Amino acid sequence: MAKKSIVNRNLKRLKTVNKYAARRAEIVSILRDAGSDIEAKASARDLLQKLPRNASPVRLRQRCALTGRPRGVFSKFGLGRIKLREIAMRGEIPGLIKASW
């Protein structure tokens, strides 16, 4: 199990990312627009730098929903590899079967 403080920190970052997502997308679109002038891009860059660091989606970490494990997480299920295997072996995930060839 991951420490609760680490898991809660990631959840707090997720809320911050969602809060600033629209504003961030608007600013980034100005920066990526080839037709915008240099002054507009400079002011957009300043606005982007004034946003909180945790508003960047890069700072998020995928974690297992059950254990909080940061590595080996299958994003389709939101579970770590260990818990995914345990749940799949019990047959609790419809359509998921063990591979055999």
Curated annotation (Swiss-Prot):
Q: Which GO terms describe its cellular component?
A: cytoplasm; small ribosomal subunit
* A biological-process GO annotation: translation
Q: Name one Pfam family in it.
A: Ribosomal_S14
Q: Which GO terms describe its molecular function?
A: rRNA binding; structural constituent of ribosome
InterPro entries for the chain: Ribosomal_uS14, Ribosomal_uS14_bac/plastid
Q: Which UniProt keywords apply?
A: Ribonucleoprotein, Ribosomal protein, RNA-binding, rRNA-binding
Q: What range does the record give for the signal peptide?
A: none
Known function: Binds 16S rRNA, required for the assembly of 30S particles and may also be responsible for determining the conformation of the 16S rRNA at the A site.
Q: Record's HAMAP family? A: Ribosomal_uS14_1 (MF_00537)
The family note in this entry says: Belongs to the universal ribosomal protein uS14 family.
State whether it acts alone or in a complex, and with which partners, per the record.
Part of the 30S ribosomal subunit. Contacts proteins S3 and S10.
Which protein, by its recorded name, is this?
A: Small ribosomal subunit protein uS14
User: Whose protein is this, by species?
Assistant: Nitrosomonas europaea (strain ATCC 19718 / CIP 103999 / KCTC 2705 / NBRC 14298)
| Taxonomic path | Bacteria, Pseudomonadati, Pseudomonadota, Betaproteobacteria, Nitrosomonadales
Primary gene name: rpsN
